[in-house]
């Protein structure tokens, strides 16, 4: 039978990168995300509709990337991670819609396999309003997308957002929904970008930045009236002209140029926010208002429970991962440092040394090898 053979492959394939386990919006429950297990269940149901079990309803858009790999920026899958499979399996198992309120915090729980060490890069969030107050089976490539958050390199602690996520104890990432959008159905796009393989300065599909998008369907309760006009479509938001295609972060790190990083695609609309450093200046902006450089990146403070409590919004900064036992009164920058240290425990220094060596062995990319040879 096809299904058992595919099931045996799952443990090997899942280890390649990773996937979401669940999504939580505001103080709501943890909604399960679509995983490779669901994909193989749907695949078996498709081949045997009599005996094959129906996959359970999940709350993120489907993907069929069996290696959990990145999406080509020029393909339709760049929208939410799995264009063809959404059309293929949505009748079998429709994507669930999560209720949300303006200003809610969204927690995305990544699996233990991702992001693996050696995949430094930024994190971004996008939204698109669906027609007729429903995102059910809406083609994400036809929507007008606007950017609500960009999380860039943090020059204070010298880490990329994906590195902060990797070092966090529970691998959760938090972002905030805008407060000025009109109510209705939206697709939310959460994306990790890995820059370890981008060689620059000549665009090359083989040695390219890697985008890992996830799609979440929400029904937004809001009193806002502003629908952003600065939009783009996927594919189309990203191009060869973006900064990420023309720069090697390993060389930029050696030359002190990481602070020059520019996020790909269009700018964040005024109701969104940006963290980190962009083109040499602090990009700490929230809801269109400049904030102090010290708040350019942050981690949320929470209890060790993975369920958000009612006061989470009071102790969470604009970007970050859930930190355990970090005081809400501490500054965002110190919270990140504390989170990184606590995530690794007492073996922080030793682990960093081992991971650096292991990272060089695992990721023998041409750009990194060239950098090591020269320096």
Swiss-Prot record:
Binding site for Cu(2+): 119, 212
Phenotype reported upon loss of the gene: Impairs virulence in mouse lungs and in Galleria mellonella models.
Protein name: AA9 family lytic polysaccharide monooxygenase CEL1
Record localization: Secreted, Cell wall
Function noted in UniProt: Lytic polysaccharide monooxygenase (LPMO) that depolymerizes polysaccharides via the oxidation of scissile alpha- or beta-(1-4)-glycosidic bonds, yielding C4 oxidation products. Catalysis by LPMOs requires the reduction of the active-site copper from Cu(II) to Cu(I) by a reducing agent and H(2)O(2) or O(2) as a cosubstrate. Required for the expression of stress response phenotypes, including thermotolerance, cell wall integrity, and efficient cell cycle progression. Promotes intrinsic fungal cell wall remodeling events required for efficient adaptation to the host environment.
GO cellular component, one term: extracellular region
Organism: Cryptococcus neoformans var. grubii serotype A (strain H99 / ATCC 208821 / CBS 10515 / FGSC 9487) (Filobasidiella neoformans var. grubii)
Gene3D superfamilies registered for this protein in UniProt: 2.70.50.70
Compositionally biased region (Low complexity): 290-341
Inducers of expression: Expression is induced under host-like conditions in a RIM pathway-dependent manner.
Cofactor or coenzyme needed: Cu(2+)
Residues with attached carbohydrate: 132, 197, 325
Record InterPro entries: AA9, AA9_LPMO
Listed Basic residues bias regions: 347-369
């Amino acid at each position: 039978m096809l299904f058992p053979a595919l099931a045996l492959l799952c443990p090997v394939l899942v280890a390649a990168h990773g996937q979401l386990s669940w999504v939580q919006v505001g103080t709501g429950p943890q909604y399960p995300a679509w995983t490779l297990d669901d994909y193989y269940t749907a695949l078996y149901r498709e081949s045997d509709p009599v005996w094959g079990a129906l996959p359970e309803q999940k709350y993120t858009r489907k993907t069929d990337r069996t290696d959990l790999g990145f999406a080509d920026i020029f393909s339709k899958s760049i929208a939410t991670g799995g264009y063809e499979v959404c059309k293929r399996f949505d009748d079998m198992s429709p994507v669930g819609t999560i209720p949300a309120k303006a200003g809610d915090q969204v927690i995305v729980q990544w699996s233990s396999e991702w992001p693996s060490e050696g995949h430094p890069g930024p994190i971004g969030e996008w939204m698109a309003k669906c027609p007729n107050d429903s995102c059910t089976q809406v083609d994400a490539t036809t929507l007008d997308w606007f950017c609500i958050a960009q999380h860039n390199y943090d020059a204070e602690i010298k880490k990329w957002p994906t590195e902060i996520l990797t070092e966090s104890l529970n691998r959760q990432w938090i972002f905030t929904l805008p407060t000025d959008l009109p109510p209705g159905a939206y697709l939310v796009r959460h994306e990790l970008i890995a820059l370890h393989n981008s060689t620059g300065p000549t665009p090359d599909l083989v040695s390219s930045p890697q985008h890992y998008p996830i799609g979440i369907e929400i029904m937004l309760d809001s009193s806002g009236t502003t629908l952003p006009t600065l939009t783009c479509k996927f594919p189309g938001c990203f191009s060869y002209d973006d900064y990420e295609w023309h720069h090697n972060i390993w060389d930029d790190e050696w030359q002190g140029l990481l602070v020059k990083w520019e996020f790909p695609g269009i700018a964040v609309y005024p109701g969104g926010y940006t963290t980190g450093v962009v083109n040499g200046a602090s990009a700490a902006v929230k809801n269109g208002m400049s904030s102090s450089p010290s708040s350019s990146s942050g981690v949320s403070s929470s209890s060790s429970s993975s369920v958000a409590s009612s006061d989470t919004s009071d102790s969470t900064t604009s970007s970050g991962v859930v930190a355990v036992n970090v005081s809400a009164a501490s500054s965002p920058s110190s919270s990140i440092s504390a989170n990184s240290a606590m995530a690794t425990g007492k073996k922080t220094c030793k682990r960093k040394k081992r991971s650096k060596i292991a990272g060089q062995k695992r990721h023998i990319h041409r750009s990194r090898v060239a950098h090591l040879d020269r320096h």
